[in-house]
Amino acid sequence: MKTSIFKSLYVQVLTAIAIGILLGHFYPELGAQMKPFGDAFVKLIKMVIAPVIFCTVVTGIAGMESMKAVGRTGAVALLYFEVVSTIALIIGLIIVNVVQPGAGMNVDPSTLDAKAVAVYAEQAKDQGVVAFLLDVIPGSVIGAFASGNILQVLLFAVLFGFALHRLGSKGQLIFNVIESFSQVIFGIINMIMRLAPIGAFGAMAFTIGKYGVGTLVQLGQLIICFYITCILFVVVVLGSIARATGFSIFKFIRYIREELLIVLGTSSSESALPRMLDKMEKLGCRKSVVGLVIPTGYSFNLDGTSIYLTMAAVFIAQATNSHMDIFHQITLLVVLLLSSKGAAGVTGSGFIVLAATISAVGHLPVAGLALILGIDRFMSEARALTNLVGNGVATVVVAKWVKELDAKQMDDVLNNRVPANKTHELSS
């Protein structure tokens, strides 16, 4: 029995995270040296993200009967993203005003090390809506795949899928080749995922060894407040959306538990992207919907990042005694509605977006970013986990709204009545 338990990726990753925490705490110098293991795993995952998105989107679109369905799916997805991410921003704003984790700190901004955040402030200057939209268009197809820019690859894949669909029977050979290539890529992903425990161990050992548990204690109130808010958002907001769509958020979380642990260990929701594409399709969502919603959601539907941005900005104001009345906070909300999309496609961009927002708002000290620089790494876990669950729920919701969801398949899989690797034929 024990052997079968430890063959589970879920248990292996959980054990690796625990060992990483212990090593980082008791042997911090050694723990900090484990960083290459985490970096290597994330790089391996990033290596296959572009081809898996391309194959999934192309075969999904080219295999559809009507191209109008693709446009409808995209429009519904963007509407959902905007509404839910706005709710996340507002919830973060309300909670941080009620709890006030930064009140009483009385930090003088002039005493903070502005140099520590200078690099983030500099990067933030390049993050704008126009720059973001232009960046979606790749300089070359090869460049899009080489850089691993999700939105650039997605744009090319959508255009390729449309063009292949228009070829009709003439494009069948190309379609078959891409579908076979997709199976090869998922085979590579299965091999890479065997290294997930090593990657999670290295990333967690580095985090604890580098920043220490002491960092958590110093600004613990903000961290606890943020984690509780993320949990409430998942259970209450996403839970209500899930219930209205016909499934349990808790059963869904159990279904993607391995992906959640991988994200917890690496602090990167991108590390689970390839597996999420596969799992959401096996859950009963049509491939074309999964291929559009998941990659787009990684830029437009980052609920955890939205909560973090409003909470962190107001926390800095509270800690530095910077006055923020209701008009300032509404301005902050409006700016975040734009800036949170402007850099969301960049991995680990939460801190950069925060720097861009504070610079744009104007009346908050940029040096105040130094207050949360040390704990940002610890908050990234909650951000990434919430983002992952949010994108999974979004995929099911959009699939149901556009009538591309096999409800029976979803119900059977979530209730363990049928293995997730068995799928029913989805009716058109």
Curated annotation (Swiss-Prot):
GO terms for cellular component: plasma membrane. Keywords: Cell inner membrane, Cell membrane, Membrane, Symport, Transmembrane, Transmembrane helix, Transport. GO terms for biological process: L-aspartate transmembrane transport. GO terms for molecular function: fumarate transmembrane transporter activity; malate:proton symporter activity; succinate transmembrane transporter activity. The keyword Methyltransferase does not apply. It is a multi-pass membrane protein. Gene3D superfamilies: Sodium:dicarboxylate symporter. Pfam families: SDF (PF00375). Its main location: membrane. Responsible for the transport of dicarboxylates such as succinate, fumarate, and malate from the periplasm across the membrane. Belongs to the dicarboxylate/amino acid:cation symporter (DAACS) (TC 2.A.23) family. This is C4-dicarboxylate transport protein.
